[in-house]
A protein has these predicted regions:
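Extracellular ligand-binding/catalytic regions of CAZymes and related secreted enzymes
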Residues: 40-49, 72-82, 88, 212-213, ...
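Catalytic beta-strand/loop cores that center a nucleophilic Ser/Cys/Thr
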Residues: 155, 159-235
Length: 289
């Protein structure tokens, strides 16, 4: 039988060992968390940044918000010191042209926005070379039949609730796209839903479905549904927000902070494009996973 002093020694050692394990686990989680956010919080040398805003729409509905979105991004560029080019012409999608940009911003693009497979491949190779990408509002309704693109943006639009005021839930309070948002944020917008979702998305913001008037709202995620997310896929960094239907939103300082934070995450930590890593030869190349 173990005497009291021996038992106490064993208990103390187990406690010390347990504390060490807890401490190690805590430190590991902190390091992992910091690793996730370090790129997003890395200061961006804005004056060295050049972005392309792409606004092409295929046959079908075209959002009236596009001029407002372009104006907002241009004004943010002037405030921060980064350059902004704008195009609705798919011929801009060549390696020579895209290699000038640190990030591409697709704002309220919809349906088919490329004319040729060569343009699609140039876009794929840009992403694979490490190019940044940000999609705004109806981006999930863009290129709905192209599997690679659907995985890039994170999902495929299926429908939205009627335009109304409803609340947003901040899922990740430390991300640059949400860190400056109010704890209670009500938007006057459309609640977008998708019928496919890439499983690797890191959601930062969600629709509060309890505040949405929609008898057909899906309850796959309980009372919330993703509205903004980020991931790193096929060599590049992507940020998407489905908010921004009404052109007036782009004058809202809060929404601008949301957009600028998303762009900051895309740009932070980015290295120069490395086309030696680009491998695409066809839009139907096998997906990374």
């Amino acid at each position: 039988m173990m005497n009291y002093s021996c038992a106490k020694a064993v208990t103390d050692e187990r406690r010390r060992t347990g504390n060490k394990i807890v401490l190690f686990a805590t430190l590991f989680m902190l390091v992992a968390t910091n690793a996730v956010y370090s790129q997003g919080k890395t200061p961006v040398s804005w004056k060295k940044v050049k972005v392309l805003v792409y606004t092409k729409n295929g046959k079908g509905y075209v959002h009236a918000n596009i001029p407002s979105a372009v104006k907002a991004i241009q004004e943010m560029g002037r405030q921060k010191g980064f350059s902004v080019d704008v195009s609705d012409t798919p011929t801009v999608f060549t390696q020579a042209s895209l290699s000038k940009y640190n990030a591409l911003i697709f704002t309220s693009t919809n349906n088919d926005v490329f004319d040729t497979d060569e343009q699609k491949v140039a876009f794929m190779r840009y992403i694979q070379a490490g190019g940044g990408f940000m999609g705004i509002h109806s981006i999930t309704g863009t290129e709905r039949k192209w599997e690679w693109f659907k995985r890039l943006v994170g999902g495929t639009f299926v429908r939205h609730a009627k335009h109304q005021k409803f609340k947003q839930v901040i899922v990740d309070k430390q991300h640059p796209a949400t860190i400056d948002l109010p704890a209670q944020w009500e938007v006057d917008d459309e609640c977008y839903y998708m019928n496919t979702i890439n499983p690797d998305l890191k959601v930062v913001l969600a629709h509060d479905l309890r505040s949405v008037n929609d008898p057909e709202k899906p309850m796959w995620f309980g009372d919330s549904y993703p509205s903004a997310w980020y991931h790193e896929w096929d060599g590049g960094k992507q940020f998407v927000t489905v908010l921004g239907h009404d052109g007036k939103m782009y004058d809202d300082p809060i929404f601008r902070k949301h957009l600028l934070g998303g762009l900051q995450w895309v740009l932070a930590g980015n290295k120069k494009l490395d086309y030696s890593k680009a491998r695409a030869v066809s839009p139907t190349d096998p997906l990374p996973y």
